[in-house]
Curated annotation (Swiss-Prot):
Pfam families: DuoxA
Name of the protein in question: Dual oxidase maturation factor 1
GO cellular component, one term: membrane
Keyword Chaperone: no
Transmembrane segments: 22-42, 50-70, 92-112, 176-198, 200-220, 248-268
Protein's cellular compartments: Membrane
Keywords: Glycoprotein, Membrane, Protein transport, Transmembrane, Transmembrane helix, Transport
Sugar attachment sites: N290
Stated role: Possible role in maturation and transport from the endoplasmic reticulum to the plasma membrane of functional dual oxidase.
PANTHER family: DUAL OXIDASE 2, DUAL OXIDASE MATURATION FACTOR 1
Lineage: Eukaryota, Metazoa, Chordata, Craniata, Vertebrata
Its membrane topology: Multi-pass membrane protein
Stated family: Belongs to the DUOXA family.
Residues in the Extracellular compartment per record: 1-21, 71-91, 199, 269-308
Amino acid sequence: MQANIFPFYPQPRTPFKFDTKIIEIIIICIVTACTFIIILPGIRGKSRSIWLLRILTSLFIGAVILAVNFTSDWEMGTITATTVYKSFSHSMLNASIGLWIGLKGLNITLIGNPEYQLNETINYNEEFAWESANQFETSYKDALERGLPFPIVYVAEKFTISSDCGLFQQYCISTYYSSGIMWIAFCSWILYNVLFSMPVILYGIYMMFVTAICMLVSLISFASVRKAPVCNIQFGNSILKTHFGVSYWLSLITGLLCLIISLVLLFLYKTQPKVLQLIFSYGEEEDLSNKSENEEEHSSVLSLNEIL
């Protein structure tokens, strides 16, 4: 390739902004929450606010479980370095290089400092999925054919199967099990919501506990990859280091919240069953029915006394 002649995209490049799947999940949860808020005035009794809190908490847990399966910030890292812009070229570029790892693959970002350099806007975000080894290798070969900037190709090469780093095997296995266990957590989330809607509270509590355990086990599976030897991704004297991202910590907080709630509900079931019935709107209806029956019996007794 001749100097200063770079391949370019056949169409204008649009950098990655938001994942449409995440937006769809957020919209569905917001619409569902608004629906429950609208019907809230039609609910009788003092347990109205408790019912709304229970619904919103359950929606939050379900939304997190579903969303983190598609996010790309379980592990992340950025570095600012001066590096070669294109392969087989002497043009240097000062840019911020980012690595974003999720359960479905990774994203590599490249943003120039400033953005406009070398007569073009440097703002890349390339996705490399690893749902299968062939898919990742195909994405990597496509990146080479398209002539992507050297930093993106260099980082992606570290995750290929043929690389000596072994990052693909480490991350692919850990994310495979993490994603699978997280989907089991989502299934158990659906089950405990169904069980809570029926008078089988104890089984619902058990399934909520299973949901929490599955989330925590999924996090442990993902974190286990950091115990393996790390292959350095180096740009000059700087090393691109990663750390746990927003999705990891959000999943951890949600899993602990789900665990605490299940243990509290189990404690109430053993010690204060009436309080638990009030939370799930069971006790109030029973008390009202008993009260109406007592009033009918009392009125019938009074009528008999008047006749006598």
